[in-house]
Amino acid sequence: MKYKLALVMSVLCAFSAWTEAKVKLPAILSDGMVLQRERPVKIWGNADKGENVTVVFKKKKFSTVAGEDGKWLVELPPMKAGGPFEMTVNDIRLKDILVGDVWLCSGQSNMELTAGRVTDKFAEEIARDENPMIRYVKIPLGNDLHGPKDDLPGADWMPLTKETAPSFSALAYFFAKEMYRETQVPVGIVNSSWGGSSVEAWMSEEALQKFPRQLHERDLFDSDEYRELCNRSGQMMNRFWDTALYKGDRGLHDGICWNRPELDDTDWQTVDMFSKEWGRKNGYPVSGSHWFRQKVNVSAEQAGKEAVLRLGCMVDADSVFVNGIFVGNTFYQYPPRIYRVPASILKPGENLVTVRLINYGGAASFVPDKPYCLAWGIDTVRLSSRWKYQLGCEMPARTNSV
């Protein structure tokens, strides 16, 4: 009995050791990835120290041993474009691998902007795209001042399809298609971008040595407690600002709400939305809330259908109402304003569109050369650039501590 128990325990211990020694790969080395052609390619990961690791790719084996820190790496020789192929790393099997050209795309919001945000101009092209030879991976957002990460969970490769195309970086989407047309080899896009990020945030500690002020900031943010304090402080300041704006907005609390059709706005100023004749005091931009009202004529046939209200882009945030009913909002300046208007809201004849525009600092504005209209497919009613205008609440510029 003791012999059997010892045998069972030995088997369990061996199984436990085998499972613990399992090789691990970073998320970006996964199904559907693209490897760079005609260059040596590194495959890496983690395992228990001393673990034997064998990579098999295109019928060739490459072996190594995990080091004292558990890390291992093998280098594949230069390869011609092609695929799809399979790869095994010990007991891990990766499928649908291509060899072609891999491009790193990086930057701020212009690179991060998705193809789904440019469907106004490229709807048909994006809706019909299918090319399994183009692959895309977006590096998840995150920061860590304690050193580079070994892995980035969530960095998953996707092929170009009509379902995935809207998730691609718009710039990278058109670039990848052009490169494939020129080369006819698989294209892999690695998008590592973060809107509004500073170049210093992407620099290593070594690279910052020549910039004492930025290096000092980096040293400050090396403290988890300091970063948390800054984040809490910024969030608290924003809450105070938002609360003060809400309480001080005459359009929300001064009798009839300014989004209501029954409000008498005859004493409101009439302004051109693209001019500088509104939103200023003594020649300087006014932060806070700005209210705009415009009446739009809709036919009986149009009123019986759901519409899309397009309001270009605005600086900074907005809430939009049709006939006093909320239809949508956006919290920052860059996205196109595209709001669905149910058929039940619209009526034949005059319909009131109201915009409550919030400006955090600098000049509030509507971006010109964008669509401003009610649309039912190709049937549209353009909005005038002339609106009734009233300042709701003047505020100091909103600032963040970080």
At which residue positions do the language-model features occur?
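Bacterial Sec-dependent N-terminal signal peptides
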Residues: M1-K22
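Ser/Thr-rich low-complexity repeats and stalk/linker segments
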Residues: K22, I28-D101
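Short beta-strands within extracellular/lumenal beta-sheet-rich domains
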Residues: A27-D31, V286-S299, R337
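Aromatic-lined ligand-binding clefts that engage carbohydrates, nucleic acids, or primary amines
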Residues: W44, W268, V296-G324, V353
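Beta-strand-rich ligand-recognition modules
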Residues: K59-G82, C313, F321-P371
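An acidic-aromatic loop/edge-strand motif
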Residues: I92-P159, S192-E277, I345-V402
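A conserved hydrophobic secondary-structure block that centers on an alpha-helix together
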Residues: L152-N191, G196-S198, Q302, A307, ...
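Extracellular beta-rich ligand/substrate-recognition surface
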Residues: K281-W291, G328-Y334
